[in-house]
Amino acid sequence: MEALYLGNLNTVEFNLNLPKKGKYGSEIHWISGHERFLDTEGNVRRPAYGTGDRIISLWAEFFYKGVSETKEYKVCILEEKPKIEVTKVEPLQKKAQAGETTYLPYVAVIHTTEGKTLVHRILWENGAKRCYGQTGGFEERGELDGLSVPVSCTVTVEKELRKEKKGTEPLIEYFDHGEASLEEGSRFYTAQKEMQEFLLQTDDDQMLYNFREACGLDRKGAEPMTGWDAPECNLKGHTTGHYLSGLALCYKAGKDGRIREKACYMIRELGKCQDAFACMPGIGEGFLSGYTEEQFDKLEKYTPYPDIWAPYYTLHKILAGLLDCYEFAGIDQAFEVAQKLGMWVYRRLSVLPVEQRMKMWGMYIAGEYGGMNDVLARLYRMSGKKEFLETACYFDNEKLFLPLEQQVDALENLHANQHIPQIIGAMEIFRGTGEKMYYDIASYFWEAVTKAHVYTIGGTGENEMFHGPGRIGSLLTKHTAESCASYNMLKLTKELYRFENQKERMDYYERTMTNHILGGREHGTTGETVYFTPLAPGFHKEFEHENSCCHGTGLESHFKYADMVYAHEGQKLYVNLFLKSRLEWKDAGITIRQMTEMEHPETVVLEVESREEFPMAVRIPGWSGEERGLWIDGKKQDTMSVESGYLCMTVPEGVHEIRCLFPCGFYLESTPDRPELHSLLYGPYVLAALSKEERFLKLDIDPGKAEQEAEKDGLTFCYRGLVWKPLFEIDREPFQVYWEKV
């Protein structure tokens, strides 16, 4: 039964392959919960546009030697794409250089009669490729594909095209290479230690199974991987990439030599696999994956999913894992393997026409490429080889980038976690090129998502997809807030804060890290992470052991908690997160021990030792009240300096205790589209009511009265006859985050 894998059942658009025989000889009979949408032959009929997605129960009955057993699968069938009536097309403008080949925009932003803002493909007269022999203005004409709506683009041709630049020197530097570390006594520390135990008990040879199998090396008796990494699955290899990153980040966080030994073994063996691939006919030098080049060949012929499954997505995970092992665990061979693999990508893509690459990246799931632009631009930054930066730009996705350039939110119907890594890549390309456009689209994307597409826990997306701006209360289902989307939003937030230390970015970071990332792990050492955090009433977290994308990012997330606690701008130190932690800033001669208790987020306690005085800024959290206090060595400071949302001070040389008080209490947040739906928060924590009720609870909650009436035990509250807990305290109990205020 466990050997049977049906593919990603969360976003089904195509027919399923439902086998009649199991891998080991069992007979399989299929039963569908709704044959109108999914029959027992695997034929899929998508719901009409506007009627919503359908989650269908599918049962497999296994019969073997007189024994039978049944397994249920949940299949989410996506509704049909809309029939579009256009009311407006956003104007298109482009600059080009005389005598150089350029391409007209492949897409336009459109507005529809249903109030939607979407991106639609353009068919240009005489194609998209242009080369203008003289300077001046030109008007190009085309139409929206399949809609016969006219489109025009104004092209300004200049003698020499100058791209607007922005400085690439970071304003902020992080302590994210082990200088900051967690200290015992918090849920964050527990999560880090338990994930470390999971990594220590993981079989390295099993993680290498698919790679050795593909290149013909001995599998050393290891069992095959399962789930999304099963031998029959086309995404196999992605978890191994996450595992490499997890080992590297774990070593950075705790300096456990056993973890580094595992990472060294993995890199040595993957190096052998890379060498073995190079000796195989039809395999290019430097190639490395959990399968041969066949999926890449098929992608270039536009083979759809599920015949192939995102080969460049898997490659991104492998490359990222290699670079993490080099940067955070100091394994030089990992850098060598990564550069060889990067050159393989360059040689493969540099010979493809622009039109072909655009069509590949536009293919649903098959063309998904994770953060290939990110990892290749990072490889350029680390190696200085311009081929890697050039290749990173091959992954520019105009369908995503163009509306963001125009400062238009056209995210609806985009697969959230497919596109967030591409924006992280835009930031990395900005660091390599200095082109302001890449920075601007990343900044606008962050603003659009965090202002109009996030739930109260910081997570985004329903059924993996972005929906219309402000659609939150109408999309509270079992399939909300994909974990790896938040993982990537935090990565993006980190990169943006590096260049503009906006306090609001750290407010979002704290909210999402605390309530979604920490709240998404299974308690104990299973290593599991929820795929979705269900925000419909009465559901519980589901931990699936199938090597999903969210399992992969979960291998990494819990080793990043200390990375953003502290930062510095020159000699000025920022305290951004309030976790029990320690900082050793050796260059400045500063040591900080933070003793903030999670049960008392209102009191930030810092023990500071410094060889000379220095400026320090402590973030004033978005959840705190107007009144605040500052004590240095027990003496209350009568005056406090507040700048850009930070409590600023000069810390004298020597050893001192700094105590900051930020009033903390209950408060409510409502959803923009259904203002009667609320969530209850206490300081940085989103509180969930323990309840099996699958209808929204109707509650009369006044935050001021709750302060007086709620019974508090640690971070557990009893109020209105209900038990309320932060999400990270809840494991498998059913709960409600949102409820109806009466």
Feature map (PLM): residue ranges:
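Serine/threonine-rich, repeat-prone extracellular segments and beta-strand-based repeat modules
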Residues: 29-61, 114-159
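Low-complexity, Ser/Thr/Pro/Gly-enriched N-terminal "stalk/linker" regions
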Residues: 160-239, 264-298
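Structural helix-adjacent loops and short alpha-helical linkers that scaffold large soluble proteins
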Residues: 175-185, 251-264, 278, 322-339, ...
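Well-ordered alpha-helical scaffold segments within catalytic/enzyme domains
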Residues: 188, 243-257, 316-332, 371-384, ...
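Solvent-exposed loop and edge beta-strand segments that line ligand/cofactor-binding
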Residues: 224-240, 299-314, 350-369, 401-436, ...
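C-terminal beta-rich recognition modules with glycine/proline-rich loops and embedded aromatic residues
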Residues: 442, 506-606, 642, 661-742
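Solvent-exposed beta-strand/loop surfaces of large extracellular or lumenal domains
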Residues: 625-650, 668-673
